[in-house]
């Protein structure tokens, strides 16, 4: 074979290949294959697809010798395929929620009909004619399951369904879709004709106060082996999956309630039946829970049904507390409109009425008002005002309806509006954000109302004065002053204030207000063009103090000669950065793209600035949306291009480089950081320098060259954690050392370093940084217990100026970093061990033991396998022993002494001598496998006269697997089994 061919073959063999999908006919050839396939966590094909394949193959028509289509033959192959489909459904516990979600109506109809046949229900028999009390349990369950599905399908067909948009299809595919649609409609037609029968059957099933059983894979196998065996082993057996009477009642009542509710519009008495069934379901849910392996009750939908039934069919028997919905419904029927208003006002404290319901009540009141009931006009405004305040508190814009009703404001309207605002903030839980929203609404109201008396009503109100900031109050006062200067002081009152045309200053103010609120680039441009057309000497980028552009950019932007272009660039960039800061990335992209398009025409420098900001935005967007998937090559290339950029005189924001470095580290693009970044950027940007050193260290791990690169990183971090020292003379004349923690000797402050690290997610990078800080922490002079970490040996063992290091800050940093790392991956045994060591070093023994046990659990499948020796080293075991000892759990101490490579008999015997143990004591003896310790326990209990405990110890010694003459393999197996059980019991105790 040539070298080229060998390379090609090696490359092909190294590619990961997806295992082939199991074909349906393979299950016919191997009886045991189906069960093995279903046990897989992500079986391919999935169970529901197998059902479709099996039934599709079993129902395929055949062709005779004359090429005529014949119905499928009843042969062994087809019977086996149908049985396989039933077994898959049995594996899914006959859960209709699962089956309905994945199977079409025709397929599920075929499946349940096969279940009826398998349960010996004669084809063509009317289920309503069957006496369920005399039938075997599995037959009853099959009949019940079919009729539950029938009425559920009827109910589901009553809901509106959004049509699925389909692209162009092949003619044969279109035919199949049309055939399936027609078949579904035919089945639905039959089900609806038999709906009353299905309801009667289910009502009868609810009268059977006994447990039910449904077929499992095992009972179906027995039926296939021996056709005479109808229901498992015997006719009246309880073989199969048990469904309790309460579970059956819960399912049946819920499904019957749904179908009765569907029939309510044509038969109002059905609402009462639905109410009774839903309330019974609610009682059963509180008793047995809303979910099981074979069913699930949607509690939110159930609550909605109960509320609707409480309104449509109020119960005189069951004393249910009147809900706001039912109260409003009754008030609407009796025309008690003040009662409706009272509920709306009270709801501002508890927010129980959703927005859709509020709007529907308002629409109904509007409709009645338009039909001639003029007295409702005032009520419509009041309800609309309540809804408007609710919308404002929930971040929604003010509706057009409110503006229409408030077009001619009056004293009464203002009084009511202020009352609603006050009520909405009466709760102790009213947040500062809610207060700010109401304050902004009232401020805007003052700026919009033309009648000065009404404006003074609002501005002089206690709520207004208490919530507005000084700056906002000044703005309103200035607005009133300007408005007052324009008002004619004649004694004759103006008949219609709305007939006065708006002045130019009013128009400018309105446009500036719109400019502040809008985030549409095109609209911003149009407003600025209008404003500059009115007056060209204003600097409109100063309209809002909230518009902030980084100082490094402002010089280039404010240097633009054309005033309109300057204002537009500044505002677009400021709004784009603001949207990015509040994580509204789509709008930020729209604004920055418009700004990029604008500056491309006249300024290469600003074009590069905008490209950099677009890159930063794309990184933020990617991290927020799909951070788990590898980024597209185009984004990686742009990040590399930014760090490799050598264009002079381009203002660079440090945060862009920081995010780019974090991005490359997270995706292991170490080559770019170590080889391709220009030296000038490394020297000028501390994050680039730190990222380069980190990348170089991670790249060399765990090789011998890692020590060299690690030394450079070590020196940089030590400098960051070092502070300048100052000497101060005390009153007694002695000189003491003062550490100035407000200054640093490094390339950045410690809090900046921690903030940067919290942008990293790559495990190796985090492990490297953790080991560095752990090593630095271990160098402090007063340390008692070292913390362990991976790769700790690559760091230097001493620091020239030890006194300059702020070890308190280092300790805080270690705790911060390990807590952050565990949010990234809570299953890293090395990080869990570091957390445990930290708790151990601070004498928090219970927490330390918890994390030591977690570290073992995550790498042993919760102690079902042996914990790797590199995780539970002798040092870790000794620390666990110390934790148990300090918690007075002395029996646990003795058992853990066996885990050491050399059993520590001295510590074990000393622990067992303690009589104030706070653990299970003799209940732990089954976990001891060392005969010497058990013999000592026997002697100890005999000496103390503790006969019962002595017998337990003797029983533990007498187990045959602990016999000293057994082979080493048997003894090792016995020890491992006891280790696993003991650690599992410890985990249950401390987790």
Swiss-Prot record:
InterPro entries documented for this protein: Int8, TPR-like_helical_dom_sf
Residue stretches of each TPR repeat: 250-288, 319-355, 569-602, 829-862
Domain of life: Eukaryota
Entry's Gene Ontology BP terms: protein localization to chromatin; RNA polymerase II transcription initiation surveillance; snRNA 3'-end processing
Alphabetic keyword roster: Chromosome, Nucleus, Repeat, TPR repeat
Basic and acidic residues composition bias: residue spans: 1-10
Subcellular location: Nucleus; Chromosome
Motif WFEF motif per record, residues: 24-29
Residue stretches of biased makeup (Polar residues): 11-22
Region (Disordered): 1-22
Major site of localization recorded for this protein: nucleus
GO cellular component, one term: chromatin
Domain notes: The WFEF motif is required for the recruitment of protein phosphatase 2A (PP2A) to transcription pause-release checkpoint.
Similarity comment text for this entry: Belongs to the Integrator subunit 8 family.
Protein role: Component of the integrator complex, a multiprotein complex that terminates RNA polymerase II (Pol II) transcription in the promoter-proximal region of genes.
Assembly information from the UniProt record: Component of the Integrator complex, composed of core subunits INTS1, INTS2, INTS3, INTS4, INTS5, INTS6, INTS7, INTS8, INTS9/RC74, INTS10, INTS11/CPSF3L, INTS12, INTS13, INTS14 and INTS15. The core complex associates with protein phosphatase 2A subunits PPP2CA and PPP2R1A, to form the Integrator-PP2A (INTAC) complex.
The protein, known as: Integrator complex subunit 8
Organism: Xenopus laevis (African clawed frog)
């Amino acid at each position: 074979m040539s070298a080229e061919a060998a390379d090609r073959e090696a490359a092909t063999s190294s590619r990961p290949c997806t295992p082939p999908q199991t074909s349906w006919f393979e299950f016919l050839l191997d009886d045991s294959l189906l069960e093995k396939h279903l046990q897989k966590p992500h079986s391919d094909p999935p169970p529901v697809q197998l059902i479709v394949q099996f039934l599709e193959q079993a129902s395929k028509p055949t062709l005779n010798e004359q090429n005529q289509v014949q119905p499928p033959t009843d042969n062994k192959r087809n019977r086996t395929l149908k049985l396989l489909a039933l077994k898959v459904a049995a594996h899914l516990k006959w859960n209709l929620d699962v089956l309905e979600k994945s199977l079409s109506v025709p397929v599920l109809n075929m499946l349940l009909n096969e279940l009826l046949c398998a349960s010996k229900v004669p084809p063509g028999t009317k289920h309503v004619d069957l006496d369920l009390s005399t039938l075997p349990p599995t037959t009853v369950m099959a009949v019940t399951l079919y009729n539950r599905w029938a009425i559920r399908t009827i109910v589901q067909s009553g809901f509106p369904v959004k049509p699925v948009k389909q692209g162009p299809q092949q003619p044969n595919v279109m035919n199949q879709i049309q055939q399936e649609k027609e078949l579904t409609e035919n089945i639905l037609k039959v089900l609806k004709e038999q709906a009353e029968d299905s309801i009667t059957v289910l009502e009868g099933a609810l009268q059977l106060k006994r447990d039910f059983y449904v077929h499992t894979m095992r009972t179906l196998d027995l039926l296939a082996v021996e056709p005479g065996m109808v229901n498992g082993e015997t006719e009246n057996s309880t073989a199969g999956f048990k469904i309790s009477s309460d579970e059956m009642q819960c399912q049946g009542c819920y499904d019957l309630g749904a179908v009765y509710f569907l029939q309510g519009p044509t038969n109002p008495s059905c609402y009462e039946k639905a109410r009774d069934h839903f309330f019974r379901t609610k009682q059963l849910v509180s008793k047995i829970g809303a979910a099981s392996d074979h069913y699930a009750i949607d509690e939110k939908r159930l609550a909605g049904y109960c509320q609707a039934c409480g309104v449509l069919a109020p119960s005189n028997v069951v004393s249910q507390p009147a809900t706001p919905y039912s109260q409003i419904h009754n008030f609407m029927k009796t025309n008690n409109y003040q009662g409706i208003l009272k509920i709306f006002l009270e709801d501002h404290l508890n927010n129980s009425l959703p927005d859709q319901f509020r709007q529907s009540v308002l629409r109904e009141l509007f409709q009645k008002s338009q039909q001639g009931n003029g007295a409702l006009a005032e009520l419509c405004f009041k309800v609309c005002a309540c809804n408007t305040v609710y919308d404002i508190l929930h971040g929604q814009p003010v509706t057009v309806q409110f503006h229409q009703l408030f077009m001619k404001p009056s004293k009464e309207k203002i009084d009511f509006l202020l009352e609603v605002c006050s009520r909405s903030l009466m709760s102790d839980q009213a947040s500062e954000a809610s207060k700010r929203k109401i304050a902004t609404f009232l401020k805007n109201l003052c700026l919009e109302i033309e009648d000065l008396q009404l404006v003074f009503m609002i501005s002089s109100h206690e709520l207004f004065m208490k919530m507005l900031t000084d700056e906002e109050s000044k703005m309103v006062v200035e607005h009133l002053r300007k408005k007052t200067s324009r008002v004619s002081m004649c004694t004759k009152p103006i008949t219609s204030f709305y007939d006065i045309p708006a002045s130019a200053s009013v128009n400018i103010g309105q446009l500036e207000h719109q400019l502040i609120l809008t985030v549409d680039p095109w609209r911003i441009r149009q407003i600025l063009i209008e404003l500059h057309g009115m007056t060209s000497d204003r600097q409109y980028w100063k309209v809002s103090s909230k518009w902030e552009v980084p100082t490094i950019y402002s010089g280039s932007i404010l240097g633009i000669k054309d005033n309109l272009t300057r204002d537009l660039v500044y505002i677009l960039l400021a709004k784009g950065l603001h949207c990015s800061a509040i994580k509204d990335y789509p709008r930020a992209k729209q604004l920055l793209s418009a700004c990029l398009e604008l500056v491309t025409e006249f300024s290469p420098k600003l074009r590069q600035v905008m490209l950099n900001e677009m890159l930063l935005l794309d990184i933020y967007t990617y991290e927020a949306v799909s951070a788990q998937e590898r980024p597209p090559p185009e984004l990686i290339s742009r990040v590399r291009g930014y760090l490799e950029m050598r264009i002079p005189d381009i203002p660079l924001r440090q945060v862009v480089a920081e995010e780019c470095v974090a991005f490359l580290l997270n995706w292991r693009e170490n080559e770019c950081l170590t080889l391709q970044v220009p030296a000038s950027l490394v020297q000028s940007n501390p994050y680039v320098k730190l990222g380069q050193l980190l990348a170089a260290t991670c790249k060399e791990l765990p090789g011998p060259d890692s020590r060299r690169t690690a030394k450079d990183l070590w020196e940089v971090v030590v400098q960051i954690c070092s502070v300048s020292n100052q000497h101060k003379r005390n009153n007694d004349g002695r000189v003491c050392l003062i550490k100035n923690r407000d200054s640093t000797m490094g390339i950045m402050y410690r809090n900046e370093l921690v903030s940067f690290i919290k942008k990293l997610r790559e495990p190796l990078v985090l492990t490297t940084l953790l080991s560095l800080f752990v090593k630095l922490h271990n160098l402090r002079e007063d340390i008692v217990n070292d913390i362990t970490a991976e790769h700790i040996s690559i760091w230097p063992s001493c620091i020239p100026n030890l006194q300059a290091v702020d070890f308190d800050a280092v300790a805080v940093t270690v705790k911060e970093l390990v807590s952050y790392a565990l949010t990234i991956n809570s299953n890293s045994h090395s990080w869990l061990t570091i957390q445990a060591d930290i708790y151990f070093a601070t004498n928090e023994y219970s927490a330390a033991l918890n994390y030591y046990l977690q570290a073992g659990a995550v790498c042993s499948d919760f102690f079902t396998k042996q914990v790797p020796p590199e995780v539970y080293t002798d040092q870790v075991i000794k620390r666990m022993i110390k934790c148990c000892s300090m918690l007075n759990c002395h029996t646990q101490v003795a058992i853990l002494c066996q885990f050491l490579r050399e059993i520590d008999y001295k510590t074990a015997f000393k622990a067992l001598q303690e009589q104030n143990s706070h653990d299970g004591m003799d209940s732990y003896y089954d976990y001891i496998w060392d005969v010497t310790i058990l013999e000592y326990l026997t002697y100890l209990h005999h000496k103390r006269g503790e006969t019962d405990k002595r017998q337990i110890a003797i029983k533990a010694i007498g187990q045959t697997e602990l016999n000293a003459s057994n082979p080493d393999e048997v003894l090792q197996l016995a020890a491992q089994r006891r280790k696993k059980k003991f650690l599992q019991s410890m985990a249950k105790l401390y987790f």
